[in-house]
Amino acid sequence: MGNTDKLMNQIFELKFTSKSLQRQARKCEKEERSEKLKVKKAIEKGNMDGARIYAENAIRKRSEQMNYLRLSSRLDAVVARLDTQAKMATITKSMTNIVKSLESSLTTGNLQKMSETMDSFEKQFVNMEVQAEFMDNAMAGSTSLSTPEGEVNSLMQQVADDYGLEVSVGLPQPAGHAIPTKTEEKVEEDDLTRRLAELKARG
């Protein structure tokens, strides 16, 4: 029983740590919003270098927030596994008592007592299956985030768009992401229609 108490204390400590990580994540989210506002003000003043620094800070805070959340999630998964282990230990003890009761029922030939014992036996097995399934579905894993130049530019452009500011000058656009104009779309559509007509004519 002492081991079970120790395990429950560990579970409590891990849950507390997970909550602390979630609080840190919320703090980073708040700081990210603050940095974005600084990006806006810097853009309004034409201070693009300052805006870039604030954008980098915002992205770094977002990265920290995600890392805190991932670590919290992994701790929750560990807690789930330990919680299952603690419950399984309790169930194992119950199973031992049930087996003893079953042996006693078999010895005395008490069918009613044997039936009641088997009901308890089956119920414990169902509990074990449910706990095992929950443990198998526990979350785990972590990935890392980077803050490339393109992401900084993207965040600055996003803030500018949100507040209706002009910042396209001096912000390099990522290759391969140009938005086609209506005229370009119309030309492509007409060209496709023409080629389909030619194919039908050949057929």
From Swiss-Prot:
State the phenotype upon gene disruption.
No visible phenotype under normal growth conditions, but double mutants chmp1a and chmp1b show embryo development defect.
Q: Name one Pfam family in it.
A: Snf7
**Which GO cellular component does the record give, naming just one?**
nucleus
Q: Where in the cell is it found?
A: Cytoplasm; Endosome membrane
Read off the InterPro entries from this record. Snf7_fam
The protein's superkingdom reads Eukaryota
BP-aspect Gene Ontology terms: autophagy; embryo development ending in seed dormancy; embryonic axis specification; endosome transport via multivesicular body sorting pathway; protein transport; seedling development; vacuolar transport
Give the coiled coil ranges.
13-51, 109-140
Q: What exactly does this protein do?
A: Involved in ESCRT-dependent multivesicular body (MVB) formation and sorting of endosomal cargo proteins into MVBs. Mediates the MVB sorting of the auxin carriers PIN1, PIN2 and AUX1. Required for embryonic axis establishment and seedling growth. Required for autophagic degradation of plastid proteins. Promotes the efficient sequestration of cargo from plastids into autophagosomes. Mediates the efficient delivery of autophagic plastid bodies to the vacuole, but not into the cytoplasm.
Q: How does it assemble?
A: Interacts with SKD1/VPS4 and LIP5. Interacts with CHMP1B. Interacts with VPS2.2.
Q: Which family does it belong to?
A: Belongs to the SNF7 family.
Q: What is this protein called?
A: ESCRT-related protein CHMP1A
Query: Source species, please?
Result: Arabidopsis thaliana
